Design a protein with these regions (language model features):
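Helix-loop boundary and gating motifs at the non-cytosolic
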Residues: 3-55, 222, 226-239
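Hydrophobic core of transmembrane alpha-helices in multi-pass small-molecule transporters
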Residues: 19, 100-116, 219, 300-314
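Transmembrane alpha-helical segments of major facilitator superfamily
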Residues: 50-58, 146, 249-258, 341-342
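Helix-to-loop junctions at the C-terminal end of transmembrane segments
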Residues: 60-74, 161, 261-273, 357
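Structural signature of the two symmetry-related core transmembrane helices
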Residues: 77-91, 174, 276-290, 370
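Cytoplasmic helix-loop-helix junction between adjacent transmembrane helices
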Residues: 109-144
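C-terminal transmembrane helical hairpin of 12-TM major facilitator-type secondary transporters
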Residues: 275-319
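A late C-terminal transmembrane helix in Major Facilitator Superfamily
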Residues: 329-359
């Protein structure tokens, strides 16, 4: 907390910008599948049609925004595009559109809105560099803001939907864009852009393989996390026979500990290095997911949920700085690549979960999630430390 108290006003505004931006998008993203099935009356498999458009388009959007930030395009107009896209998406959803319109128009618009997170993280990194703020700790606070937002946003939407319906919930989400816009106006100077940097030679015709391998580590961790998160509710309730509220308790325990772990991750990275922290997170994930596959009581779920929060908090606290360290001269590209690695991991995890569960069981999905930590350790063993700059 003393770190934040010592930050200049602008740095604190950036933290608030990231928090409210994440709260806005998190009020839409986790509800979408529920909305497609319950709100629009579609079949569950049709969720994949929407997700199959949003995920790859988000990857493209993040790449384009990252390249423009590295080419010294001002941050403010790029971020405004994503905020406007979010507002349009929330208004579209509040109209309860036909499914074809959601897929044809809503999915591309949501992909543009998703680009806000990458842009904000790049802006935070650039601001920290310019003002001599310790980057690893500041990134950890940015990531903690996202984690806190995801505690608030989804819960707010689901409770509102349960009480008054989808239309009101999405109108509230649209209203949140007003706060996001005010923070955008206050936190981002009109002419803020990346500094000009000397070109750094890369290997093998411009392909930075070490940067890609660093991003692959994040993709593999994201695959395991999404495999578990997607299968966990049905495994607990259907296969283990635990009460319906059990998944919510697990998520709550995870989120609380995750925030604490993000604080400690930066200090551990300073002492042992980010690769060691990520390796520790992967080992903890393997053990935790394997234990989850054998739970038989709510108490066990809550305890393991807290441990899961610690592993994911370690990852969340250092991952973005870890990837950025392999491209210090191109923070926009590195940040976009990091965000895309998470979206790619989420896409692979969500699709794979359905096939594995259909062929075997939801318990098998959780075992696969545990096994996904092994290639993380192998990739970290191969990956060399970043070049000093």
């Amino acid at each position: 907390m003393s770190f934040v108290l010592q930050l200049p006003r602008q740095a604190v505004l950036i933290l608030l910008l990231v928090f409210f931006g994440a709260m806005c998008t998190s009020s839409l993203i986790p509800v979408m599948g529920f909305f497609i099935v319950e709100g629009l009356g579609q079949q569950p498999w049709q969720i994949a049609l929407y997700s199959g458009i949003v995920a790859p388009l988000t990857i493209v959007v993040n790449r384009l925004l990252g390249e423009r930030l590295d080419r010294m395009v001002a941050v403010k107009p790029l971020l405004l595009i994503s905020i406007i896209a979010y507002l349009l998406m929330a208004l579209l959803l509040s109209s309860l559109p036909p499914f074809w319109l959601l897929v044809a128009v809503g999915a591309p618009v949501m992909a543009v809105a998703n680009g806000a997170t990458s842009t904000e993280f790049t802006y935070g990194r650039l601001y920290a560099e310019r003002h001599g703020i310790e980057i690893t700790q500041y990134n950890a606070w940015l990531r903690m803001g996202v984690s806190l937002a995801w505690v608030v946003g989804p819960a707010m939407s689901f409770i509102t939907i349960d009480l008054v319906g989808f239309r009101v919930a999405y109108m509230i989400s649209a209203g949140l864009a007003g706060i996001w816009f005010v923070l955008w106006h206050l936190a981002v100077p009109n002419d803020f852009r990346a500094p000009q940097r000397p070109p750094r030679p890369v290997e093998l015709d411009g392909i930075d393989w070490w940067l890609l391998l660093a991003a692959l580590v994040c993709t593999l961790i994201a695959i395991g996390n999404v495999l578990f998160t997607a299968a966990m509710p049905l495994f607990f309730v259907r296969e283990v026979g635990l009460p319906g509220y059990t998944p919510g308790l697990a998520i709550s325990a995870k989120c609380v500990v995750e925030v604490i772990a993000i604080f400690s991750a930066a200090r551990l990275a300073e002492r042992f290095g980010p690769r060691a922290v990520l390796a520790g997170a992967a080992i903890l994930a393997i053990l935790t997911f394997a234990a989850f596959a054998q739970v038989s009581s709510v108490l066990q779920v809550v305890i393991l949920g807290a441990i899961e929060g610690y592993y994911y908090g370690l990852f969340a606290g250092v991952a973005i700085s870890f990837v950025q360290s392999y491209a210090p001269d191109k923070p926009g590209r590195a940040t976009a690549l990091f965000m895309n690695s998470l979206y790619l991991g989420g896409f692979i995890g969500n699709v794979s979960m359905g096939f594995i569960a259909d062929a075997f069981s939801f318990q098998a999905v959780i075992y696969v999630a545990a096994a996904s930590g092994v290639p993380v350790l192998l990739a970290l063993a191969v990956l060399r430390p970043p070049r000093s700059t």
